[in-house]
Regions:
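Short glycine/threonine-rich loop-to-helix capping motif typified by GTGT followed
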Residues: 403-408, 450-460, 492-500
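Accessory alpha-helical/coil subdomains and C-terminal extensions
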Residues: 251, 262-264, 270-289, 300-438
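Glycine-rich phosphate/adenylate-binding loop
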Residues: 441, 453-491
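A glycine-rich phosphate-binding loop feature that marks nucleotide/adenosyl-phosphate handling sites
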Residues: 335-342, 395, 444-447, 483-491
């Protein structure tokens, strides 16, 4: 499958998931954590027969069976086991070359080197919901029974499966720009050198660098990448789309690459997994490890992805400008459009953190513009009562109100209609029609929020993710990604991460907090 089609395949696989419901919660965030979904079926006598099917896999659960929890957890453990090169090759591990001891003659406990036991696990879900009516409840059964969800803890292992001096490692950055890309590249190089790897290269301009003539490998070392974190963008360059998976693996094989680090979002992760599978098919001893990158924060199971905090921080600058413009004008309306194709995390968090937003519109929550309970009517009320207002919209919001397009970009993403411009025009027309003066200022900081340098919070996250990606590769894992889950760093199989994108849960406490802050009503 061409990698440019990976995003299409990824999005198509989500439709069935988002159409279902959690028990008693018809939201668009059913798949946020990948737990099983429930269906209630009425029997002929009118009683409810309860069944569940896992989001991934073919597991059917009968909750009247006392062993259903055990079956569920066994299925979870199977799904979240990490692919390893020993699944294909008969290899013996060797002692790691990763050491933080500066004096080779000094003896110290293993814990001083920060080794992680291969059986360490991190708990993914920590809230024990008492009822399926609790805000944000994610329930497997109608009683919201507690079931543990464990994932593999990330970090350096005491045993490795590669000889560092023989390793050739490659790094590629895919998709769009994101604050922190250079921080991740830098830490991957630093950590590889600590292990003893001498041959490190960068693949220029995404997957395109594997096949485009004239794009040569870029030799990387600590000296080369020492200060690249001081600037935004990608030191290696980025691009969307790419060649067929087989052509990329042909290039990997010809270049004798042993480790490939893919920094990218959902589509790039799907591509990385396809590369991993093709390498396995050809019996190539190649570890493919991904690092989740997206300012949209829509990677499943992750607390957050790098670049998100920086994007929210930068978005506040635009919101503050819109606030000042609106506050200073007679009947001023500030309108800000933020990134978020299918998720409203940036818009929600920027609205919360700024405290200046009166209306926040996101893709996960439907709304109407016209009518007594529409957005425009509420804006009328705001101008009458406080004299001005500020509106924040995610780019993917309100697409059902616009003419749909079948056009796609190089990554296979549907090109969205510009709701921000549509909203601006609707506001102007509405107030003109009712004879009220409205001074509308529209701000679109789309590329400003992603082209900047990572802030301190994201820089730390990037540092750890880059280091853990290398630890995962040397531990022999492939087809995995490194992320932060429930405040702990973990390794996850890419196959589970790309099941569906993460969405804002309209029943969650965070969205409720946003509504409390804005004071906006339901727009229906």
């Amino acid at each position: 499958m061409p990698l440019s089609g990976m995003a299409i395949a990824f999005k198509a696989s989500t439709s069935a998931c988002t159409a279902q419901q959690l028990w008693g919660h018809p939201t668009r965030d059913q798949c946020q954590y990948g737990f099983t979904h429930l269906n209630e079926r009425k029997s002929r006598k009118g009683s409810a027969a309860l069944h569940a099917r896992a989001v991934s896999g073919k597991l059917d659960l009968d909750f009247s069976d006392p062993s259903w929890k055990q079956k569920y957890q066994e299925d979870w453990d199977r799904r979240f086991s990490l692919p390893h090169i020993t699944d294909v090759f008969d290899l013996e591990p060797r002692l790691t070359t990763f050491s933080l001891k500066k004096n080779s003659d000094a003896s110290s406990p293993d814990k001083w080197n920060g080794y992680v036991n291969k059986d360490d696990r991190a708990l993914l879900k920590v809230i024990n919901y008492a009822s399926n009516t609790s805000a944000g409840a994610e329930c497997i059964d109608p009683d919201c029974s507690w079931v543990e969800h464990w994932v593999h803890r990330a970090g350096p292992r005491k045993e490795i499966y590669y000889e560092p001096e023989e390793v050739k490692a490659a790094i590629v950055t895919c998709g769009g720009l994101c604050p922190g890309l250079n921080d991740v590249i830098r830490q991957i190089v630093f950590t590889l050198e600590i292990y003893g790897v001498k041959n490190i290269v960068g693949i220029q301009f995404g997957y395109r660098g594997f096949f485009e003539k004239g794009l040569k490998e870029m030799p990387l070392s600590r000296d080369v990448v020492e200060n690249i974190n001081l600037a935004g963008g990608s030191f290696l360059g980025v691009s969307r789309g790419g060649a067929k998976t087989s052509e990329i693996v042909d290039s990997i094989q010809a270049r004798r690459i042993d480790m490939l680090f893919v920094i990218g979002g959902n589509g790039s992760h799907a591509g990385a997994n396809a590369i991993h599978e093709e390498c396995r098919k050809r019996k190539l001893k190649v570890s493919v490890v991904a690092v989740p990158k997206t300012i949209d924060n829509d990677i499943l199971f992750m607390d957050k992805t790098f670049g998100f905090d920086t994007a929210v921080e930068e978005a506040q600058r635009a919101i503050n400008s819109a606030y000042i413009e609106a506050r200073s004008a007679y009947h001023g309306v500030g309108l800000v459009k933020l990134m978020g194709r299918s998720t409203g995390f940036i818009a929600m968090h920027a609205s919360l953190s700024s405290g200046q937003i009166d209306v926040c519109l996101i893709p996960e929550v439907s709304f109407t513009l016209d009518g007594e309970h529409g957005v425009l009517s509420h804006l009328e009320h705001l101008l009458e009562t406080k004299g001005f207002c500020v509106v924040c919209v995610a780019e993917g919001a309100g697409q059902d109100l616009l003419q749909k397009s079948n056009a796609t970009d190089a990554s296979g993403n549907v090109i969205l209609s510009d709701f921000g411009v549509h909203m601006q025009q609707k506001i102007k027309k509405h107030f003109k029609d009712i004879g009220v003066l409205a001074d509308v200022k529209y701000i679109d900081p789309t590329y400003m929020v992603r082209a900047c340098r990572a802030n301190a919070s994201d820089a730390i996250l990037c540092t750890v993710l880059g280091q853990n990606a290398v630890h995962g590769a040397f531990a022999g894992f492939s087809g995995i990604t490194s992320g932060i889950c429930n405040t702990h760093y973990a390794f996850l199989p890419i196959t589970e991460v790309i099941t569906t994108p993460k969405h804002v849960n309209p029943n969650s406490r965070m969205w409720h907090r946003c509504l409390t802050s804005t004071g906006q009503p339901d727009f229906h």
